[in-house]
Structure formats: C-alpha cells, structure tokens
C-alpha cells in the first residue's frame, strides 16, 4: 500500500486513488485548503511513505524522527522545505489518522534563519525584463513585478481579471484563499494589450502548452533563468525576487507598510514589516552617531629639534 500511495501522486486525478490518500484529500477539501496546498501535502506524505517503503499509516513516532533527521542531515533541505514536510505530516497524523499523541510534540519545527533576500535595484529590474525575449514570458514576468504577484497567482490570471476601467488586477483565490485587488500600471496594461492581441487568449491570460491549462510555474521559472543568463546580472533572479523588489521599491518610494500588506496579500503585518529591514534608503538616510562626535583638533606635527 505504501508504494501505491506514493506512486499515485503524479498520476491524473481521474485515476483511482488509495482509500487512505482519498481520505486525506477529502480532509483537506472540507477545510477549504487551496489546491496547491493539497497537492503539496499529498506529495510530502507520499515521499515519507516511499522513504520507508510502507504505507504511512503503518509508520510511527520513531519513523517520523528518523525521517526528520534524514531531511536535515542527508537531504540537507532548507528549513522552509522541512516546514512544509512537517506541516503535511502533522495534518496527516492528527487529522486523517486521528492519532492520540500530539504531532506538534513529535514534529518540532526547525528554527528559520532570518535571512534577508537580495533585492534588485529598479535599473536591474528594467535590464532583466529587457532580456526576456518571448512576448508571453515577458508579459507574465513583468506582471509579477508590476503587480507584486506570486508566481502561483500570475499563472492563474484570466483576461477578465484585468480591469482597465478601474485600473486594477483582480487576484482570485490567492494564498490563504483570499481574493484581492492590486494596482494596474498603465505601462503594464500597454504590455498586456500588445501581448493579448497576438494569441487573444480566452480562458487563461497566459495559456500553457496543454490545451485548457495555464502556463506552468516551471515554464515561467525556466524562462526567468534563461533571461537571467542573458542579462549577466550577478544577483539571483526568480519570479519571487521580482515580488520582493516590488515591495521594497514601493517602501523606498514612500508607501506605508499597511498598503503594501494589502497589495501583497499578507495575512500578518509582521510579515510585511520584514521589508523595513531591507529598504536601504531608510538606512542611508539615517546618520551614524559617529557624525555627531566633535571633530578632533588637528594634531600639529612635532617640532624640529634645535641644535644651535
């Protein structure tokens, strides 16, 4: 059963799922988890089962501990990646299996290092976007920056989400299953119109290679990597780093943190406040206390000795 649970993850949903996998999927659906979260959690439990070659309901606390050590020491996953795996296993054991022990005690979350993202300057963003040669890829990556969208949100846009009358973009079912509106830049609108005139997409603003499906995040990531190579920028560039740049550039231009929180779709203001640590204009505009110290009087050179 363990192999079957793991092997079905990549198969299409019309195929038969194991009862255990079906039950976990239903547990997430009734709690209104996003589709991305459901797929991520199912994949993490699948990887857990494959690691031991057993059905996950046959595994216990010691197996979980062994798996955590494996993820950290052998796979050398980043804390964020381990967080996702632990969140999935916590849900599986506490909700789907209804284990009587507390998963939070057995599955401690690793402490995340407070690393600051590397931020592109406005000139670097402009140079990078100029290196995205494909019209569709240029349009979607420009949207990630101009509207501050997550890549998962950008790929799900529909033509009807672009409201040129109110000059807003509707972001439907973003992270946390919350809709929101973000600004529609006149420059972005012009780029989107130029792009839309060519294929005239109907269902998805950025359709993928598969009929009836949007462009995949992997495809956008590959286009981003190709443009980064062409740009020869020393800083790393991903679709998410364009979103980071959007937030920091707004903050440096004088936008308040609360407005940026609404635009980014952050649930907590504390998440948005992290960008205060990155906005360099705030740092550069603050004088060092060293400047307040009085300048020492110049020391005269030593007098030459008199010999006669």
UniProtKB/Swiss-Prot annotation:
Keywords: DNA integration, DNA recombination, DNA-binding, Plasmid, Transposable element, Viral genome integration, Virus entry into host cell. One of its GO terms (molecular function) is DNA binding. Residues 15-97 form the Core-binding (CB) domain. One of its GO terms (biological process) is DNA recombination. InterPro entries: CB (IPR044068), DNA_brk_join_enz (IPR011010), Integrase-like_cat_sf (IPR013762), Integrase_catalytic (IPR002104), Integrase_recombinase_N (IPR010998), Integrase_SAM-like_N (IPR004107), Tyrosine_recombinase_XerCD (IPR050090). Residues 115-288 form the Tyr recombinase domain. The active site is at residues 150, 175, 240, 243, 266, 275. SUPFAM superfamilies: DNA breaking-rejoining enzymes. Pfam families: Phage_int_SAM_4, Phage_integrase. May function as an integrase. Belongs to the 'phage' integrase family. This is Putative integrase/recombinase y4qK.
């Amino acid at each position: 059963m363990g192999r079957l649970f793991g092997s079905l993850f990549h198969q299409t949903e019309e195929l038969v799922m194991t009862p255990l996998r079906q039950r976990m999927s239903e547990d997430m659906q009734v709690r209104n988890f996003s589709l991305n979260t459901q797929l991520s959690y199912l994949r993490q439990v699948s990887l857990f089962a494959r690691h031991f070659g057993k059905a996950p309901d046959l595994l216990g606390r010691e197996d979980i501990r062994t798996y955590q050590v494996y993820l950290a020491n052998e796979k050398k996953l980043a804390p964020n990646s381990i967080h996702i795996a632990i969140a999935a296993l916590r849900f599986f054991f506490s909700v789907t299996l209804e284990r009587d022990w507390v998963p939070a005690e057995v599955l401690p979350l690793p402490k995340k290092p407070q690393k600051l993202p590397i931020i592109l300057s406005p000139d670097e963003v402009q140079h990078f976007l100029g290196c995205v040669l494909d019209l569709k890829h240029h349009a979607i990556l420009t949207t990630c920056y101009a509207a501050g969208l997550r890549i998962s949100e950008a790929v799900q846009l529909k033509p009807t989400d672009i409201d040129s009358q109110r000059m807003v973009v509707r972001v439907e079912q973003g992270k946390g299953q919350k809709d929101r509106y973000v600004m529609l830049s006149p420059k972005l609108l012009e780029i989107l119109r130029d792009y839309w005139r060519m294929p005239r997409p109907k269902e998805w603003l950025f359709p993928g290679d598969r009929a009836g499906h949007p462009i995949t995040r992997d495809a956008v990531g590959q286009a981003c990597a190709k443009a980064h190579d062409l740009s020869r920028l020393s800083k790393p560039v991903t679709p998410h780093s364009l979103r980071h740049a959007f937030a920091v550039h707004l903050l440096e231009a004088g936008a308040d943190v609360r407005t940026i929180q609404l635009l980014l779709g952050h649930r907590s203001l504390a998440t948005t406040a992290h960008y205060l640590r990155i906005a360099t204009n705030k740092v550069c505009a603050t004088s060092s206390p060293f400047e307040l110290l009085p300048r020492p009087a110049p020391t005269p050179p030593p007098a030459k000795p008199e010999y006669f």
